[in-house]
């Protein structure tokens, strides 16, 4: 733990090197065999295995997801846009306020600047894959749309009804809600079989977990495609219901 590390460093600073190293080794050994450490190691391997094998999940062949739409350009929406564009996807971010779009763009520019391993041309190409818009039309043909608007079921129903007709033929509509039941939100959808919950954690660029929530009518193909999408953007997808 951080407390033990600090204590060990402080105590070791007053000792000769051999005794300080012995003190450090004893402290490390005590932490390494503690119940907390064992639980963290077990959880790490569980998540890694789940991400690689997806045991128990449907084997339906997932159709490609190449173009995604994101509704809402806040921190969540901008984060989703960046991680998706970083994996080569075409992204459209739609918001009702230009100020929000400008903030989302600035967020992605700042994230791109942190990628020191990328050349300037590669950063420019990444950012160019993201379209920022006040209009609905650029969302046409999206294979997946994720709404990240306010936690209000009426607002979510409205954007579902506005955007669903623009989806690709087999397009999926997903909600990033953290509180509203997916089956309830799916009532606003025309095709409930392709309505699903994709709950990301903020900041999206750093948090690895992706919770997938199925509605009562969500089909296996939709689930399989969303699992594939989650793995593509580097997340650990877990079906929570």
Tell me the role of every PLM-derived stretch:
Residues 96-100, 113-184, 188:
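Rossmann-like NAD(P)-binding element
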Residues 8, 31, 79, 83, ...:
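Generic, well-ordered alpha-helical scaffold segments in large soluble proteins
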Residues 52-111, 131, 215, 219:
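NAD(P)+-binding Rossmann beta1-loop-alpha1 motif at the extreme N-terminus of oxidoreductases
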Residues 1-64:
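Intrinsically disordered, low-complexity segments enriched in small/flexible residues
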Residues 91-96, 147, 207-215, 239-241:
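Short beta-alpha connecting loops at secondary-structure transitions
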Residues 212-241:
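Internal alpha-helical scaffold of NAD(P)-dependent oxidoreductase catalytic cores
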């Amino acid at each position: 733990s951080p407390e033990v590390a600090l204590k060990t460093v402080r105590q070791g600073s007053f000792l000769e090197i051999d005794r300080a190293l012995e003190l450090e080794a004893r402290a490390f050994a005590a932490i390494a065999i503690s119940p907390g450490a064992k639980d963290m190691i077990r959880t790490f391997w569980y998540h890694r295995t789940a991400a690689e094998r997806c045991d128990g999940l449907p084997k339906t062949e997932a159709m490609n997801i190449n173009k995604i739409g994101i509704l809402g350009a806040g921190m969540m929406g901008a984060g989703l846009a960046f991680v998706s564009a970083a994996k080569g996807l075409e992204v459209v971010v739609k918001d009702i306020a230009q100020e929000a779009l400008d903030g989302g763009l600035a967020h992605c520019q700042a994230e791109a600047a942190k990628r020191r391993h990328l050349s300037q041309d590669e950063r420019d190409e990444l950012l160019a894959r993201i379209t920022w818009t006040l209009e609905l039309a650029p969302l046409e043909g999206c294979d997946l749309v994720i709404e990240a608007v306010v936690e209000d079921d009426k607002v979510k129903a409205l954007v579902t009804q506005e955007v669903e007709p623009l989806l690709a033929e087999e397009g999926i509509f997903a909600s990033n809600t953290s509180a509203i039941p997916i089956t309830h939100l799916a009532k606003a959808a025309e095709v409930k079989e392709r309505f699903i919950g994709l709950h990301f954690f903020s900041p999206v660029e750093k948090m690895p977990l992706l919770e997938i929530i199925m509605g009562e009518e969500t089909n296996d193909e939709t689930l399989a495609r969303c699992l594939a999408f989650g793995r593509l953007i580097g997340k650990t997808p877990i079906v929570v219901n």
